[in-house]
A protein has these predicted regions:
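Amphipathic alpha-helical binding modules
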Residues: 56-91
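Short terminal alpha-helical segments
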Residues: 1-30, 82-89
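Amphipathic alpha-helical interaction modules
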Residues: 16-63
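Alpha-helix boundary/N-cap detector
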Residues: 1-8, 28, 32-35, 53-56, ...
Length: 91
């Protein structure tokens, strides 16, 4: 997978999170999630290894991003984005 595709997926996630309220069922605020994603984007842009474990946790089913996306009406978009991240993690 091209790293640009992962970066685009993470940036799209940030765009949605910036418009979202933190989920009451999540143990992490939208702002905290954004900070973690920005770190991973920076690593990817600088040809450094991304933290696969962090991405797995953030994008896991019933994880913090999915909970936030459902609570804010972009759950279907999350599934599409998560598929890109899963492709990266699996590859």
């Amino acid at each position: 997978m091209e790293i640009e595709k992962l970066i685009a997926a993470l940036e799209e996630t940030i765009t949605h999170l910036q418009k979202s309220q933190s989920s009451g069922s999540s143990n992490m605020s939208a702002e905290e999630i954004i900070r973690k994603l920005e770190v991973e984007i920076s690593k990817a842009r600088n040809a450094k290894p991304t933290d696969v474990y962090t991405l797995e946790l953030l994008f896991a089913p019933t994880g913090v991003i999915q909970e936030t996306s459902i609570d804010n009406g972009w759950g279907t978009r999350f599934l599409r984005i998560a598929a890109v991240v899963d492709e990266f993690i699996g590859g």
